[in-house]
Structure formats: C-alpha cells, structure tokens
Amino acid sequence: MAALELDLFLCRTDNYGVLLHDRLSGATASIDAPEERPILDALERRGWQLTHILTTHHHGDHVAANASLKERFGLTIIGPKNEASKIPGIDRTVGHGDRFDFAGHPVDVIETPGHTSGHVCYHLPEDKLLFAADTLFALGCGRLFEGTADTMWQSLSRLMALPDDTAIYFGHEYTLANAHFAITVDPENSALKERAAEIEETRSDGGFTAPTTMGLEKRTNPFLRAGDPKIRALLGMEKASDAAVFAEIRKRKDNF
C-alpha cells in the first residue's frame, strides 16, 4: 500500500482542491488553498489533520483560505520566493531547483513563470507526481497574466522534461473547453479526437479529468506540440521558432 494518498475535490466554481496525505506520519498538505469549506469537508471526510499548504502562486483563487486555515491548524505555508510578499501567511520560501522534504517524500521546486511572474510547480520524483496549478492544464496552459509567450514556453519545456508517466494534478477543471479548442489546432490527431470523446463522456457524468500524465499531454495538448510539423503547417508557421508557434496558439485560445 502506497504511503501517499490524494483526495481531489472542487472548490469555488472550477478550482481543484487537492490534499496530499502521508499515512505513516499523518502529515497532510493542501496544494494551494482556494476555499476553506471544501478543504475542511475533505479533511473531515478522510479524518486527516492539515499540516502544510504548498502555494504555487499568488492569485486570490489559490490563496484565499491561507490565513484562516493557518489560524485553525497552526500549519506551515510554503510558497514561491518571488511572490512571497503577495502570499498570506507564508512561512518558508522556495525557488527553482530547491528540494524540500514532505513527510519523507522529496519535493523538487520547478519555477514556471508565465501565468504569474513567480509561479512554481511541485514535483515529487519518487512518487511520480506533479502539481502544476495554473501553468499546465489538461489540454491547455495558463493565461499569460505576468509573463511573455517566450517565458511560458520555457516553463512548459521544463515540465516536458519530466518522465512521461508523471501524474499531473492541475488547478482548474477547464478540460472540456480546452478539448474543443485543441481540435481546431490539431484536427488530424487521432489520439486527441479519442481523448476529446472520453472527456465529453466524463464531464457529462460530472466526473473529474484530473489527473493527466505528461505522456498524454505531449501527445494531445497543442500547447506542448509547437514543434509538430502538422500543427506548424496548419498555422502557416513552418519556419517559425517553437516559441513563436506557441505564442500563436496561445493567442488563438485567448480569442476562442
């Protein structure tokens, strides 16, 4: 039996709440803190006590419950050093290349600026888990609020270097809309069309599309496929850089 358990649920409208629990120590981390009540309900349902919040970035829909949960549990909040002044209750700052321990599980910090200037993702290499928040979604990526397309492409390239069997938990349930857009960019991709049909069925039943895997995203997510000749030809960008192709795809999604 694996030492780590995860509990996945919705917060607010479409934010994912994720609890990461170590059976041996009893430690429990919330990946971001979008909303207090759903997190408390999940903790009560599982019989867990919250010990950590791992904050990925400063947006309000990811830090809204930091202060109230810290007051209730006396927990430790870890977050990106480049956004520390914007993260309520932060205790420990981390940056790219840092490694820290969560209940005996190594956690690597990957800085992924683009959505925000200091956004980080948390990678647990031994457990094959990535918490990508608003950098990488199933069939999508985050909007560029504080970064350029070049910066975001570099961030996504960092994530693409992870093993294909890495399970990815992302910040929002946007997958159905992402699938509708992805088909317009990559219409001949049979793996994408098959996946889109599965997503339609999953969402019609009220199911969640998280987690995904890095291998699946590399095969079907147009934002990771800027180097694909078919996509480049469809966009008329055969000689453009990968970053420029990515920028065009991001622009089209913004206007979709």
Swiss-Prot record:
Cofactor note: Binds 2 Zn(2+) ions per subunit.
This enzyme's EC code(s): 3.1.2.6
Xref: InterPro entries: Clx_II_MBL, Glyoxalase_II_hydrolase, HAGH_C, Hydroxyacylglutathione_Hdrlase, Metallo-B-lactamas, RibonucZ/Hydroxyglut_hydro
Keyword Transcription regulation among UniProt keywords: no
BP term (GO), one: methylglyoxal catabolic process to D-lactate via S-lactoyl-glutathione
Pfam family, one: Lactamase_B
Enzyme category, top tier: hydrolase
GO terms assigned for molecular function: hydroxyacylglutathione hydrolase activity; metal ion binding
Pathway: Secondary metabolite metabolism; methylglyoxal degradation; (R)-lactate from methylglyoxal: step 2/2
Family indicated by similarity: Belongs to the metallo-beta-lactamase superfamily. Glyoxalase II family.
Assembly and oligomerization: Monomer.
HAMAP family linked: Glyoxalase_2
Name the UniProt record assigns to this protein: Hydroxyacylglutathione hydrolase
